[in-house]
Amino acid sequence: MSISPQEVKKLRDATGAGFGDCKKALDAVGGDFELAKKKLREMGIASADKRSGRDAKEGRVFSYVNKERVGLLLISCETDFVAMNGDFVTFGNSLIKQLVESGKDSLDEQQELEIKNLAATIKENIHVSKIYISNIASNELVKNYLHGEQSKIGVFIKLRVDDVLKIEDGSLNSLTMDLALHVAAFAPLYLSVGDVCPNYIKEQEEVFMKQMEASGKPENVIKGIVSGKLKKHLGEITLLEQGFVKDDKLTVKEKIEEVSKSILTKIEIIDFKYFSVG
């Protein structure tokens, strides 16, 4: 029999389940409203979707890397207790592995259903908040890092070298791992100053100028101070200009140049990502 949109909407309003799930449930039971509600409960969908309005401010970051790709996944939940739950952790590790191996940065219907079933089992609002997948070329080296027992911070960084034979070099691998730790510690927003939106730079400059208006200093002095403040601020939010985590006398850019000279090949950061809970 044909299921009308009005019937689907009625079931959706009653259960909070998604339009597609309601249509499937009604089709499965020949359009019987009560049986369709029961079907959704059996699937764990209705109860999970009713919880979807609750705040999910906790969670966990998952990561996986193979020879072809690296990925990060942030799954949100309501409590840190659930973020430590064995079923939750096992599911997250399995899901990020599936995503990396497939190269997909979005969930398919089966994966969406598995999340709803997990939410129904654990009885919390659980959802995927972020996914990021990045390919790895033969001359690129990746390190990922999850911080702490609860993995509330997860990062990866990807470096490229001109000489592919240097990929296994110990100094390069140590640098890459140190840079992953650096990203976790300092959470840069951009790779370089050139990546920062010009409008943001202009707005920030105006903020600093406003702050100096009441100083009474000459205009040329104010401009110099503002220029210094802006340079310092951009250095704090861009990875290459930040002080290196293991030696803040060097910027990250200078540390990369140092290692590059020592192993006789050009090194550059081409991608990084920082995920955090909350």
From Swiss-Prot:
Sample GO molecular function, one term: translation elongation factor activity
Keyword vocabulary terms for this entry: Cytoplasm, Elongation factor, Protein biosynthesis
Region called Involved in Mg(2+) ion dislocation from EF-Tu, residue ranges: 79-82
Gene Ontology cellular component list: cytoplasm
The UniProt record lists the keyword Metal-binding: no
Function: Associates with the EF-Tu.GDP complex and induces the exchange of GDP to GTP. It remains bound to the aminoacyl-tRNA.EF-Tu.GTP complex up to the GTP hydrolysis stage on the ribosome.
Family listed: Belongs to the EF-Ts family.
PANTHER family: ELONGATION FACTOR TS, ELONGATION FACTOR TS, MITOCHONDRIAL
Descriptive protein name: Elongation factor Ts
Protein species of origin: Borrelia hermsii (strain HS1 / DAH)
